[in-house]
Amino acid sequence: GKGRVWMTSRVRIEANTDACKAGSTNSSANYFPLNSSSRHASYFDPDTEEMTLIDTCYSTHHLQFASDADDTLWFSGDTQAIGWINTRLWDETGNELAAQGWCPTVIDTNGDGEITKPWNEPGQSPVAGRDTRLVGFAYGIIPNPRDGSVWITRTQPTPGQILRLDPGSNPPFT
């Protein structure tokens, strides 16, 4: 690591810009647009004594680094999606939109081994043969260094959930 202290911070008002919505250059925005985020990312660099704010399209709460070549920083804290920052890409480009990604939590309920749209949405009558999207406040998050998956806890719906997210080789599409 670079000795920075990463944290979550409020960077702006909740309404997301068009960069977080369909038509954006960000693949996550086109795959699963987000309209708002209440808390974002930041870090303090002790060497320069500077604070850097990073606007994220997803809300953040808890954060954890993965053991991967991109020094991926995973975030819980959104009810609709799980987010990440590719800190290697951030360091190379300084482009907050290009360095971030997110995806919804969708279960392969049709059993075909892939997550495909359209899926069953929360609160709607399920359609047979579709995968199912889950929502709820994502509280804790921990990457698994053995297989690259990410484990999250959800506080809602009661009594809560423990979910394993496999980002695949081309997130958010896999």
What are these regions (language model features)?
Residues 4-8, 70-76, 149-153:
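Conserved beta-propeller blade signature
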Residues 57, 112, 135, 141, ...:
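Helix-coil boundary/capping segments in enzymes
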Residues 1, 43-45, 66-67, 86, ...:
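Acidic/polar residues at beta-strand termini and the immediately following turn/coil
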Residues 48, 54-65, 71-73, 155-172:
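Internal alpha-helical scaffold/solenoid segments in large eukaryotic proteins
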Residues 1, 32-58, 87-134, 173-174:
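Surface-exposed loop and turn segments in beta-propeller and other repeat-based domains
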Residues 1-2, 62-70, 125-147:
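Structural signature of eukaryotic scaffold interfaces centered on beta-propeller domains
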Residues 7-36, 79-105, 155-163:
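Short, conserved, GDST-rich strand-edge loop motifs in beta-rich repeat architectures
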